[in-house]
């Protein structure tokens, strides 16, 4: 290693004295000796001037000679080339002790005589990783982080942009955008490597708004595959989302549910600044570098949450313990160096992480000049990476995923909720502050599970008009959030409106007037960045939004790995790839499906319905269907195929009616689903069907099928899956929806929601979309894991009312499907559009603070809050939709995993 100031490989090196001065040359000493001889004669000559000594001219000649000699020596040993030309630049002179009209050594700063270009020539290259025209041809110094010297290629220490700046070659961003049809890799690369590159806190909107200032990222977007919004996981925090990206798991599944959390079973707390962060017990699931290790694929991680922790006893082959002070350029250069390792050492998968623009967003807010500067900085750094890949011949070989973990929101001190305002004494509780706040008792773990969270949630509900927070017992949170099934998630959580945060009191708040994140993952300002670029990705493609849990399966496909079990839908991102690797298939039906003919005899149901509404003889005739009738019914009621039953050992009757189709569970004695089509011009009748039921003789009769069972219950009643008022076939066809096979136990408070949905919203949706197909049914999720419960769990959670065992649903689902082309009806769709909802079934409507409100002011808002993916409905019901469609399964997975973004954040 050469010392700073020495020039490597160029001429002799001069020694220096201990005080930093150069040692005196012997030749100079001998030449200076005559100066001593000339001093005394000169003085004598001046005193003897009046006498005009004849030796005067000799003395003057000698003095003149000495002066000339002194000047020459000064030029040689002091001023050097400045004698011939005045030197005003430090180029080639950095940190040398040479004297001129300006200096370039470290002392010049204190002396105040530095050359004007000292800073940019000698100082900036010690921490700047790029060349400029002025640096080209500079003298190499070891203290420079990279070189722009003419021979830097030989020494392999060139700055990344040396070729474009000093050799007038095009940089990567200046080259034309070409489709990479086949990988163009160096011979030593058997297959394209993959790099996962995270720009923390890069809000999706940044690229929409400031793309013109970001030439490199914009080129990647235009030349690769891009989505306007990648949906993060909830809460939209750094550690949970980075770990979701590399595991394909929800935070509730992989255990990292927040940047700060408490585990009552471990009785330990996790934070980003604690040593507990390195405890492997916090990390569940299998990150991709562990997956790679199991399949003998090497990985290198330059920072990624979890990558410096022994998960399953495994670390990446190359990794760095997180240190935020490491310059961004150093991280990029390290990855480029790893790509040059011998093939037996070289990783095949890489991660790279930068803290910006998150850091600037937190400090100054998302709409600030500082964030714009941070965006331009990371754009230059991405350009540095691409230029480095180009120099290595990897710019058309490596598959790059440029990604972020979440967005950023502007905070306001006026948009903070403080619980002490409502609770008074708060000494017995602790709140994890923010937009996804959680509460637990201070006395943990002793009272963690026994604390009366329900009473506290009720106390904090509907305290004031237009309340900006909602307290939730976690089983009632929107199922799309998947934020319940973990002991690390406190039983009481808070859902905040856009831009709002919550803390126990003002002293515990943070990010009051600056940027923050963590809110609902459907809020537009929480959306993240995704760009895929490389030979595997499509050229110039823009795709619909998707969730970041899908990226793990995508990366496994790129690397040729078999994914570990995860929450993603493998194959749902096939449309991003030129040549998809994995070909998904529909799940196999597991339930026992049968036809159920009329067997039973009629009984008194204890109803008080007008006889003219349900003439029994005519009603029975309607159920005698021909084969042709059944075909027509299937075409009308399940145009995309009936839902398949994935519930193992489950016995289901398929019941056909003129207007709807039912999958009736003989195990639960209630319908699992009902399907019908609501055309644009269909109308609802005004008949009053309350207290009207007709016994379905095709199924066993249960006490829960009788009107009399519900008469004395003030809260529990029954509801119809298919609305009786929908009568679209003929005026002579009586409402088959009054059949006992169409009812489910339903709280009276929920009937308000259900009736408004049927009587008002479905009519409007059918008119707007030129008709809709509707599938609805009960949900049982007593263990709140977002998956259908086993028969054993259902039995444990059944209730006894009036000496009769009854199973009350925890939720109800609705799946609405229509055509993308509004000119088509639901019976002839060329392409589908869907929306799904999973509504909590609660004995009150306190969630919506409905007192004094009309249904029109809150029901649709509730539906929007509890919107879900079709995939979420499938997981929680054990059903599978759209299996008779002609589209590929991967195309259907795109449809099933879609969710719209909440764009209005007033």
UniProtKB/Swiss-Prot annotation:
DTMP binds at residues 238, 259, 322, 358, 406, 517. The modification Phosphothreonine is found at residue 238. Changing residue 237 to A: Decreases phosphodiesterase activity by 40%. Decreased formation of nucleotidylated intermediate. Zn(2+) 2 binds at residues 358, 362, 517. Disruption phenotype: Mice show ectopic calcification of articular cartilage, the joint capsule and certain tendons. Mice also display calcification of the joints and vertebrae as well as soft tissues including the whisker follicles, ear pinna and trachea. This calcification worsened as the animals aged. Bone mineralization in mice lacking both Enpp1 and Alpl is essentially normal, demonstrating that Enpp1 and Alpl are antagonist key regulators of bone mineralization by determining the normal steady-state levels of diphosphate (PPi). Bones and plasma of deficient mice are almost devoid of PPi. Changing residue 517 to Q: Abolishes all phosphodiesterase activity. 60% activity can be restored by addition of Zn(2+) ions. Abolishes formation of nucleotidylated intermediate. Keywords: Biomineralization, Calcium, Cell membrane, Disease variant, Disulfide bond, Glycoprotein, Hydrolase, Membrane, Metal-binding, Phosphoprotein, Repeat, Secreted, Signal-anchor, Transmembrane, Transmembrane helix, Zinc. One of its GO terms (cellular component) is basolateral plasma membrane. Residues 1-58 are cytoplasmic. Glycans are attached at residues 161, 267, 323, 459, 567, 624. Zn(2+) 1 binds at residues 200, 238, 405-406. Changing residue 308 to A: Decreased phosphodiesterase activity. Ectonucleotide pyrophosphatase/phosphodiesterase family member 1: Homodimer. Ectonucleotide pyrophosphatase/phosphodiesterase family member 1: Interacts with INSR; leading to inhibit INSR autophosphorylation and subsequent activation of INSR kinase activity. Ectonucleotide pyrophosphatase/phosphodiesterase family member 1, secreted form: Monomeric. The nuclease-like domain is most probably catalytically inactive as residues that are essential for catalysis in the DNA/RNA non-specific endonucleases are not conserved. However, it is required for the stability of the protein and the catalytic activity born by the phosphodiesterase domain. The di-leucine motif is required for basolateral targeting in polarized epithelial cells, and for targeting to matrix vesicles derived from mineralizing cells. This is Ectonucleotide pyrophosphatase/phosphodiesterase family member 1. The gene is Enpp1.
